[in-house]
Amino acid sequence: MIEADRLISAAVINDEESIDRAIRPKLLTEYVGQPHVREQMEIFIQAAKQRGDALDHVLIFGPPGLGKTTLANIIANEMGVNLRTTSGPVLEKAGDLAAMLTNLEPHDVLFIDEIHRLSPVVEEILYPAMEDYQLDIMIGEGPAARSIKLDLPPFTLIGATTRAGSLTSPLRDRFGIVQRLEFYPVADLEHIVSRSAKCLGLELTPEGAHQLARRSRGTPRITNRLLRRVRDFAEVRADGAINGEVAMKALDMLNVDAEGFDFMDRKLLLAVIDKFMGGPVGLDNLAAAIGEERETIEDVLEPYLIQQGFIQRTPRGRIATNHAYKHFGITREE
């Protein structure tokens, strides 16, 4: 089992990027949730426009699927400038980054996704570009090689990462604006899925929106994916409208329960409860019991279960909490 196989994966699956682009908010006034981020960015953007300056460099971090790319697009739209998009793994050589930087117009936004995966050589090029709007490049090879400086137009670098701790200090310190995106509450996800349904021309009742939102693991990308799958169910098994009952039947059929857990989440929790008496159980034993690799458990399955308080990670191993027992209606033996 890999993350991309799961309906409730926060990673991008197949052609979702193009679909999400169609329903993505374009301006801060359309942006739902993250009130602290929205308020701060409104002020920073308005101040930069009043001064006629490029917006300061922005670092956006947080779990996948929370809208880092969406926020980068909104910032460029609000500033009225072009957005150039790339990612850390794509920028393999210093020349790749230099080509992008030299093609920027004044105040343009350069968005680098997965910025924590930049190679050290490419990262070194970024330092003077971010700080002084200058590009240091080498011309020629061997003894005849020489360094020249090119002036760059003022620009805004927006870096996005799910692993802010993996950034080097010199790179992290060059971002004047740092924004952390948090998991969304159900109420915000209800607004998001209602807006998405409207963009897609779907009839979605408040009860249907609530069922989708509460099972979305606090992640808009999952909300929108579930909406598309429930739409399919509603068109085939109902009259096309998505109400609470239709949404519940569709999501139950898709094996997404009221907590947003899928088959693999439940399999892991029940293994700890039934096979290991609630734990503690070592990671290798747990991996063998459910037929998964330990890396899959650590990186894919565990994080959300731990965050929601269903699993505890202790020095002796994994323990199922009272929440886990209650979820399955199992009485915990003392």
From Swiss-Prot:
Database matches in Pfam families: AAA_lid_4, RuvB_C, RuvB_N
Enzyme class: hydrolase
Domain of life of the native organism: Bacteria
Keywords: ATP-binding, Cytoplasm, DNA damage, DNA recombination, DNA repair, DNA-binding, Hydrolase, Nucleotide-binding
Residues engaged in binding DNA: 294, 313, 318
Entry's Gene Ontology molecular function annotations: ATP binding; ATP hydrolysis activity; four-way junction DNA binding; four-way junction helicase activity
Location within or outside the cell: Cytoplasm
SMART domains the record matches: AAA (SM00382)
Catalysed reactions listed for this entry: ATP + H2O = ADP + phosphate + H(+)
PANTHER family referenced in this protein's UniProt entry, alphabetically: HOLLIDAY JUNCTION BRANCH MIGRATION COMPLEX SUBUNIT RUVB, PTHR42848
Family that this chain belongs to: Belongs to the RuvB family.
Known role: The RuvA-RuvB-RuvC complex processes Holliday junction (HJ) DNA during genetic recombination and DNA repair, while the RuvA-RuvB complex plays an important role in the rescue of blocked DNA replication forks via replication fork reversal (RFR). RuvA specifically binds to HJ cruciform DNA, conferring on it an open structure. The RuvB hexamer acts as an ATP-dependent pump, pulling dsDNA into and through the RuvAB complex. RuvB forms 2 homohexamers on either side of HJ DNA bound by 1 or 2 RuvA tetramers; 4 subunits per hexamer contact DNA at a time.
HAMAP family attached to this UniProt entry: DNA_HJ_migration_RuvB
Protein name: Holliday junction branch migration complex subunit RuvB
Organism taxonomic ancestry: Bacteria, Pseudomonadati, Pseudomonadota, Gammaproteobacteria, Enterobacterales
Gene behind this protein: ruvB
